[in-house]
Amino acid sequence: MGWAAEAIHRDGIQHRSKRRDLLEILIPYGLVLGVIWTPRPIQKWLWILAAAVVVLVTAISWPGLDAMGLRRKNFLRSLWIVGAAMAAATVAVALAGHLHTLYLHGGPLWLLENYWLYAIWSGAQQFLLQSFFLLRFMRVLPRKWMAALASAGLFSLAHMPSYILVPAALVWGFLACLLFLRYRNLYPLAMAHAILGITIAITIPGAVDHNMRVGLGYLHYSPRYHWHHPLWMRRSPQP
């Protein structure tokens, strides 16, 4: 009985109805899509509502820090994920430099000043993907890989209609979910997400990926409007 209780605590699996889990998936995700596809100023209030619902549902259904991957265990073992992201970023930056598409005007300090907000947003996205949606899909679907694929599918659809970010989000989302299931540590995945996202931002021209915007922001993107904004707003990925 002890090992069973430990497994339940680790995986965040509880005896509860699938209907409740589906509602906890569909309602927050519907609000996320509302934020993405709603114009301002309504978007601001929907964003607040969506964040509040996620926090409330997480608090009510609290699975524990270990289940959500907010722990020290396996952190060092999974740091290779960050190294792999850095290696991929190095190759992408070198290729962008060769193709003259690199948008990099400084060193680490410049990156920190321009992309610190996106780094935080990357962690929030990984929390939603793994600690929120994946845990619930694991209780709804019979196989873990199915839960990983379903979570990645939602993550990818939230990046519509960007033809660059949709496939990138699907691939990264699926791999990240599988890695989360293996190591159950969110921190390296959040760091890798930030690295890969910033790499896309500085290697692909804003006119091509619409400044990494999604939803209504992607459709309303204007290069002329883009260049009248400060540097950090022009090329920072947009939450």
Regions found by a protein language model. Name each.
Residues V166-H226, P230:
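Functionally important transmembrane alpha-helices
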Residues W45-V53, L111-W116, I120, A124, ...:
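Membrane-embedded alpha-helical segments of multi-pass membrane proteins
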Residues M1-L65, A201-P239:
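N-terminal, membrane-interfacial amphipathic/helix-forming hydrophobic leader that caps
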Residues G34-P39, V93-L104:
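Juxtamembrane "helix-exit" motif on the non-cytosolic side of transmembrane helices
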Residues P41-L49, E113, P142-S151, N185-P188:
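Membrane-interface starts of transmembrane alpha-helices
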Residues I81, A150-S151, M191-A192:
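Hydrophobic core positions of alpha-helical segments in small-molecule transporters
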Residues Y103-L157, P161:
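Function-critical hydrophobic alpha-helical transmembrane segments in multi-pass membrane proteins
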Residues A5-P28, I48, W62-V91, G106-N114, ...:
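Interfacial transmembrane-helix boundary/kink motif in multi-pass membrane proteins
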